[in-house]
Amino acid sequence: MLTNMQIAALMFLSFALSIIWAFIIIRKENLSLKPLLYIFLFSFFAVLISILMQTIVYFLSQDFLKTTGYAYGILFDCFIHSSLPEETVKALLFSIFVKLLWSDKMKNMDEITPAQNRANIRILMLLSVFYGLIFASFENLAYAIRYPEAIWLRTFTSNILHACLGVYYLEISMVQKTRKIIKPFLFTWGIHGLYNMFFSIGSYFVIFGIVIVFFVISNAVSRYDRFKSN
């Protein structure tokens, strides 16, 4: 069980990364605080809605969990109870942010220059990373209380994982055809589920969770480069 001082240090570390990233966005893009505050609120509400959805799934699955074995229980908890509601809510709320608060910059794609288009996408990418960092910061608090084992390592890797998955929320928010949403969403769901599973099992399996984080970093960078060039 973590002490109050340890929890406070954990939260400081988590939100420090978010604050540093916000400072980078402001300096690099000369952006006002307004979109960052909106992102903070959208991410905070994503946390609350995710918790609500996960609670509903948990109560609806009580009978199933009583009869299932350890392996199926881990899979259900990591992929259905935890990852699926969370990734659905995060992708949906970020899409709402883009549609409601950024559509005026993106709707007239034929009237803006390629340089302006790249600048808009770059800013949205930076904001999507900030979105993931804020979500991870709040989530780390919940995990610190419920699952204190390996929480320090999980805090660092979780922040990076959520930040990199932000690139996929950006892609989901900007595709025009519904079928093109499926692939990036399945990726975020599957990767997040695997990450949760390895950290839930613990021991040496945590190494596989760290490998997943490095894979997501590489994949997110290449994904952004392809997305930006389209």
Language model segments and positions:
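Hydrophobic alpha-helical segments at protein termini of multi-pass membrane proteins
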Residues: M1-N230
